[in-house]
Regions:
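N-terminal Rossmann NAD(P)H-binding glycine-rich loop of SDR-like oxidoreductase domains
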Residues: 1-23
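SDR active-site strand-loop-helix element
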Residues: 6, 31, 67-71, 108-113, ...
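A generic structural motif
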Residues: 23-29
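Helix C-cap/helix->beta junction micro-motif
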Residues: 24, 62, 103-104
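N-terminal Rossmann-fold cofactor-binding loop
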Residues: 30-37, 48-49
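NAD(P)H-binding glycine-rich loop region in Rossmannoid oxidoreductase-like domains
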Residues: 46-89
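NAD(P)-cofactor binding segment of oxidoreductase domains
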Residues: 67, 81-109
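Catalytic helix-loop patch of NAD(P)-dependent Rossmann-fold dehydrogenases
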Residues: 88-96, 116-139
Length: 139
């Protein structure tokens, strides 16, 4: 199974990538944005997620069966100070990945954040309606 981890050099991506590589049957390819990874145990692609042409190229070359989307601007303060850029990356980038997954018949696994909830209640469940109170949560 060909797995593409978009945002594979981030905190969750690094651990997920290692686990998948250790298991047989997974051909793992990952992307990074600003810092090239130090390990060379698999294929890496440089990707600025708002570069739709580059994203198209990666999908054509990798031909993933599964895409795990982890790329985002996740620092709340950075998002609040640069809302337009955060929307481009976190919303438009995700939309493009979703479109390409549909086009290439790849399953999409998208991880989100607890910031989609207001945070005043706690113990949220998967079927609770989102009610973000930050731009990061909205993106």
């Amino acid at each position: 199974m060909r797995v593409l981890i978009i945002g594979g050099s981030g905190f969750i991506g690094r651990y997920l990538r290692r686990q998948l590589i250790q298991k047989s049957g997974f051909d793992v390819t990952s992307t990074y944005d600003s810092r090239a990874p130090k390990d060379t145990d698999q294929s890496w692609y440089s990707l600025e997620i708002t570069d739709h042409h580059r994203l198209d190229q990666i999908f054509l070359e990798v031909r993933p069966n599964v895409v795990v989307l982890l790329a985002a601007i996740a620092d709340v303060k950075t998002v609040e100070m640069g809302q337009e850029r955060a929307t481009e990356v976190n919303v438009d980038g995700a939309r493009q990945v979703s479109r390409l997954c549909t086009q290439h018949h790849a399953r999409l696994i998208y991880l989100s954040s607890e910031y989609v909830f207001r945070g005043d209640r706690g113990n949220y469940q998967e079927d609770d309606p989102p009610d973000p109170n930050t731009h990061y949560g909205r993106t």
